[in-house]
Design a protein with these regions (language model features):
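Structural signature of Gram-negative outer-membrane beta-barrels, strongest in the C-terminal barrel
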Residues: 336-485
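Gram-negative outer-membrane beta-barrel transporters
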Residues: 337, 379-382, 477-486, 504-588, ...
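N-terminal periplasmic "start-of-domain" segments of outer-membrane beta-barrel proteins
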Residues: 23-55
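A beta-strand signature from Gram-negative outer-membrane beta-barrel systems
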Residues: 120-166
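Flexible loop and strand-edge segments within Gram-negative outer membrane beta-barrel domains
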Residues: 202-208, 217-228, 236-295, 300-324, ...
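C-terminal beta-signal and adjacent terminal beta-strands/loops
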Residues: 483, 582-589, 597, 608-654
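Membrane-embedded beta-barrel scaffold of Gram-negative outer-membrane proteins
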Residues: 291-307, 425-428, 454-511, 516-520
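Extracytoplasmic beta-strand/coil segments of soluble accessory domains associated
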Residues: 63, 67-104
Length: 654
C-alpha cells in the first residue's frame, strides 16, 4: 500500500467531493465503516491522524502525535511520567476538551486533562477540531469547548476468524519497560468484546545540563520514576440492524515521582503522586430511518489522587477525590433534502472532596442544550448552532459561586468556488466560555467564589485544497487558516496583601496563521515518499491595561513561531521515518524581559521499522532514536527534557 498522508481526507468525502488520486494510490485501500473528518472540506479547522499514518510516522506516544498538529502548544514537564497538557491557539488547556470514544473526559478540579494517561497502542485515530465541528450529530458538551482533541480507540477486526490478538513490547533508555496486550473475541455476528492491558515503568533518571543565568548546572533528575497500569474492556453489541450498544470499562493506576524544578545546588526531591482513575461508559444508537436517528451515552467517572512530600518542616499528605456523572442524548433529523437539524441535551454532576483544611466539598450541576442546523449544497455548506448553559453549585461550607446562564452561538461556512475542483474557502465564528474550576473557586486561601467565567470569541478564515499536481506530486493537500481570538475576564492569580488570589483581571488578544501541508510521491515500484509539514504563527498579547508594563506583551509559554514536520520513505526492505518538532522562544512569566526568556528548541527523531507477514501472522520491528541533538531543552522553565534516547518496539499480531 502506498504511503498517503491525507488519504483519510479523500476517503471521507462523498462522490461529489471525491479527489482523483489515481488508481495506483487507491489500490489495496479498504474503506471501513468509521468515517474520519474530511479536513479538506470542513468549515472549521480539523486535523486528523489515523492509525496507519501514526504507524508510518513511527510515533509511539499520544503527546508526540499531538505535536504534529498546527496551533497546538504542548506543555510537557519532561520524562516518561511528566504531566502533558494541550493548549490550542494560546487559549489554555482548560479550553481544550478531550474526548475518549466520543465521550468527554472531565476534571472539575483543575480543568486540565493529562494526555500522558492514554496509550497510543489501541488508538485508531486522533482528531483535533478548532472551533465548531461540522458534525452536528454530537454531544452538547462538544459544543461547549473552544477546541477538542478526540481519541478513538480501535475496534476489533476479525477478518476470517473469531478472534484477534496483538502483543507489543517497548523498551528503551532510562529503564523503560512497556508491555501491552490487545485481545478481541467474536461470540456471534452481533456480539463481540475486546480487552486491552498495559504496564509502564521507567526510572527516568536521566542526565541533564542547563544554564542558571551564567552558571551551568549538571546533574541527574531524581525522583522521576513511574509505574502505571492501564486496562480497558469493551463490549460491542448490534441489537438490531438499526440499533447498536457499546459498553466500556477503563482503569488507570499510577505511582510516580515528581522531581520538581531544578534548583541550583539542591537536587533533593521527594514528592510522590498516586493516581487512580476508573470510569464506565456506554453508548447507544438507534437509526430509526434515513431521516431520523438518536444516540445516547452515560458515564460515571471516579478519580482519586494522593500527593505526599517529605519537607524539612515535616511530611505532608494531601488526598483528593472527585466523581462525575454524565448523561447525554442527541436527536438528528433531516426533514428535507440537504437540510438537517440536531438537538442535544447533556447533564453533568461533579463533586470534589479533599483532606485540605476548610475543604468546602463543592458540588456542580450542569445542563447543556445545543440546537444545530446545517444546509449542504454541492458548492457550499452552512452550519450554525446555539448552546444554552445553566450551572448551579452547592458547598457544605462557605459561599457557593453564583448560578451561571449563557447563550453561546457558533457558525461556519465553506464554499467551493469551482464545482469540479477541491479548492475551498471557509470561515467560522464561535462564542464560548469556560467555567472556573473548583481549584479557582474553592482552593484553600487562593480560591475566589466570586469569579466570573472566562469568555472567548474565535474568528477563523481559511482555504483548503487537495488533489493531484501532475508531475509535481501524486497527492497534495494544503490548508492555510488565519484567526483572531479574544479572551475576556481571564482568570489569573494576582498578589494581595498576604496571599495570591484568583481574579478576573486579564484580557488577551491572539492573532495568527496555521499552515498544514501533506504530499506523496511514488518513486518506483514499492518505493514511496511521504511528507507532512505544519507551521504556526501566534501573536498572543496581554491587553488588560494600556498603562500596565505588560501591555502588548506575549503571554507566558506561547511561542510566536512553532511547527512540526515529517518524512517517510517506504522501501521493499525497511521503512524510515524522520520527524521534527520545533518551537521558537517563549517567556516563562507575563513580563517579556530577557531573564524570563526560554530558548528555542528543535527535537529531531528517526525511526526504522519493518513488517514481516507469514500465514496470517504479522511481526513489526521498530527502532527509534529521539532528540538526536541531545539537548536538554526546556518546554517548561527549569524542567529539562531528556537528552538523546532510544526505544525498541516489537509488535506481534494474529
Amino acid at each position: 500500500m502506498s504511503f498517503c498522508m491525507g488519504a483519510v481526507f479523500v476517503l471521507a468525502q462523498n462522490g461529489a467531493d471525491s479527489v482523483d488520486v489515481g488508481l495506483q494510490q487507491m489500490k489495496g485501500l479498504t474503506v471501513t465503516e468509521k468515517v474520519l473528518p474530511a479536513a479538506v472540506r470542513s468549515g472549521a479547522p480539523v486535523q486528523t491522524l489515523d492509525k496507519a499514518e501514526l504507524e508510518r510516522m513511527g510515533v509511539l506516544d499520544v503527546s508526540d502525535a499531538v505535536r504534529h498538529f498546527s496551533g497546538v502548544t504542548l506543555k510537557d514537564y519532561g520524562g516518561v511520567g511528566g504531566l502533558k497538557t494541550v493548549s490550542v491557539r494560546s487559549l489554555g488547556a482548560q479550553h481544550t476538551a478531550v474526548l475518549y470514544d466520543g465521550v468527554a473526559i472531565g476534571d472539575c478540579q483543575s480543568g486540565q486533562v493529562d494526555i500522558s494517561r492514554f496509550s497510543l497502542d489501541n488508538v485508531s485515530s486522533l482528531t483535533l477540531t478548532i472551533g465548531q465541528s461540522d458534525n452536528i450529530y454530537q454531544t452538547a458538551r462538544m459544543s461547549a469547548a473552544a477546541s477538542a482533541l478526540s481519541i478513538e480507540t480501535s475496534r476489533p477486526d476479525f477478518e476470517n476468524r473469531d478472534f484477534s490478538l496483538s502483543a507489543k513490547v517497548k523498551t528503551g533508555s532510562y529503564g523503560l519497560a512497556n508491555p501491552s496486550l490487545f485481545y478481541a473475541h467474536r461470540f456471534t455476528s452481533r456480539l463481540s468484546c475486546s480487552l486491552y492491558g498495559e504496564y509502564l515503568r521507567a526510572d527516568g533518571n536521566y542526565h541533564f545540563t542547563m544554564m542558571n543565568l551564567t552558571k551551568p548546572i549538571e546533574g541527574r533528575r531524581n525522583n522521576s520514576d513511574i509505574g502505571a497500569y492501564r486496562a480497558e474492556v469493551n463490549l460491542f453489541a448490534r441489537l438490531t440492524e438499526r440499533q447498536d450498544l457499546d459498553v466500556k470499562g477503563y482503569l488507570f493506576d499510577s505511582r510516580r515521582g515528581l522531581p520538581g524544578s531544578v534548583v541550583y545546588d539542591n537536587p533533593y526531591a521527594a514528592e510522590r503522586l498516586y493516581d487512580r482513575n476508573y470510569f464506565g461508559q456506554l453508548r447507544y444508537e438507534n437509526r430509526f430511518s434515513e431521516k431520523w436517528k438518536l444516540k445516547a451515552s452515560g458515564k460515571f467517572n471516579y478519580s482519586w489522587n494522593k500527593d505526599t512530600d517529605k519537607k524539612a518542616a515535616g511530611p505532608t499528605e494531601d488526598r483528593f477525590r472527585q466523581t462525575e456523572t454524565y448523561l447525554t442524548a442527541t436527536l438528528w433529523a433531516t426533514p428535507v433534502k440537504n437540510l438537517s437539524f440536531s438537538l442535544a441535551q447533556d447533564f453533568v454532576y461533579n463533586d470534589l472532596a479533599t483532606t485540605l483544611e476548610e475543604c468546602q466539598y463543592p458540588e456542580r450541576y450542569t445542563s447543556l442544550t445545543a440546537f444545530s442546523a446545517q444546509y449542504h449544497h454541492p458548492l457550499f455548506q452552512v452550519t450554525a448552532s446555539l448552546l444554552n448553559t445553566f450551572i448551579t453549585e452547592r458547598v457544605a461550607l462557605g459561599r457557593a459561586a453564583d448560578d451561571r446562564k449563557r447563550l453561546s452561538p457558533a457558525v461556519s461556512l465553506t464554499w467551493r468556488p469551482v464545482k469540479k475542483a477541491s479548492w475551498r474557502l471557509r470561515a467560522s465564528y464561535k462564542d464560548i466560555f469556560r467555567v472556573p474550576t473548583f481549584n479557582d473557586l474553592y482552593y484553600l486561601l487562593i480560591g475566589n467564589s466570586r469569579l466570573r467565567p472566562e469568555k472567548t470569541r474565535q474568528w477563523n478564515v481559511g482555504t483548503t485544497w487537495a488533489g493531484r499536481m501532475g508531475r509535481v506530486a501524486d497527492y497534495l493537500s494544503l490548508s492555510v487558516d488565519g484567526y483572531y481570538n479574544e479572551v475576556d475576564d481571564k482568570i489569573v492569580a494576582v498578589p494581595t496583601m498576604f496571599v495570591w488570589k484568583m481574579s478576573n483581571v486579564g484580557k488577551v488578544e491572539t492573532y495568527g496563521v496555521d499552515v498544514n501541508l501533506a504530499a506523496e510521491w511514488t518513486l518506483a515500484k514499492a518505493w514511496n515518499l511521504g511528507m507532512t509539514a505544519a507551521y504556526s504563527f501566534m501573536q498572543a498579547e496581554d491587553v488588560t491595561k494600556r498603562s500596565s508594563k505588560l501591555w502588548r506583551h506575549q503571554i507566558a509559554y506561547t511561542p510566536k513561531h512553532s511547527g512540526a514536520g515529517g518524512l517517510v520513505l517506504e522501501t521493499p526492505w525497511v521503512n524510515a521515518a524522520y520527524n521534527v518538532a520545533w518551537s521558537g522562544e517563549r517567556y516563562r512569566l507575563p513580563q517579556n524581559k530577557e531573564s524570563n526568556l526560554i530558548d528555542a528548541y528543535a527535537d529531531h527523531s528517526v525511526s526504522l521499522y519493518r513488517v514481516f507477514q507469514f500465514k496470517g501472522h504479522k511481526l513489526r520491528l521498530q527502532v527509534d532514536a529521539a532528540n538526536l541533538g541531545g539537548e536538554n531543552y526546556e518546554v517548561v522553565r527549569y524542567y529539562p527534557m531528556p537528552g538523546r534516547n532510544f526505544k525498541v518496539a516489537i509488535t506481534y499480531s494474529l
